[in-house]
Amino acid sequence: MLKLLSEIGPVIAFFAGFFYGGGIQHATLYMLITSVICITLCYVIDKKVSKLSIISTTVLLVSGSITLISGDSMYIKIKPTILYVIFGIIFLMSGIRKNPFIKYALESIVRLKEESWITLSYRTAAFFFFMAVVNEVVWRNCSDETWVKFKVFGVIPITFIFILLQLPLLLKNKLPDSKI
């Protein structure tokens, strides 16, 4: 539950900051503060923070700080693209190297045949590359308000749909001792 809150909390703070705090600058500040609080809580409570969370928070701190200092919202808008490309490369390379990163992230929930982990890695890489393109199209062609709404009401459902589309692979290839 803490992991979910640490992922969604900054998005909610960004949305609230944009619509109730006065625009992208406030939203960025709220998201930076919330992200630092969330990652700190994860470390204090769980005594660990995932590598993906560290990468995500680092990119956020850099792009968010540049946005706040420069006043240019482009930097916070390209943050998702940068993260999606980094994650896409991580999942793609781990699949190519036959050492699927996604296995380490999900193995406590589901146990799969090894070739299924590799397939899931490639699919996840493709999803992240797709999301990078979508983010670029939206932020470059839409208003700040539309981009913010897309981040909250578009990305979450698209991600959920992607996860649902993976269920047949997971259910077909799960090992007998799997939790799902």
UniProtKB/Swiss-Prot annotation:
Q: What is its main location?
A: membrane
Instruction: Name the family.
Output: Belongs to the YciB family.
Q: Does the keyword Zinc-finger apply?
A: no
Q: Keywords in UniProt for this one? A: Cell inner membrane, Cell membrane, Membrane, Transmembrane, Transmembrane helix
Segments passing through the bilayer? 4-24, 25-45, 49-69, 76-96, 118-138, 150-170
Per its record, how is this protein called by name? Inner membrane-spanning protein YciB
UniProt-annotated location(s): Cell inner membrane
Superkingdom in the source lineage: Bacteria
Q: Which InterPro entries match?
A: YciB
Which is one Gene Ontology cellular component term of this protein?
A: plasma membrane
**Record function comment:** Plays a role in cell envelope biogenesis, maintenance of cell envelope integrity and membrane homeostasis.
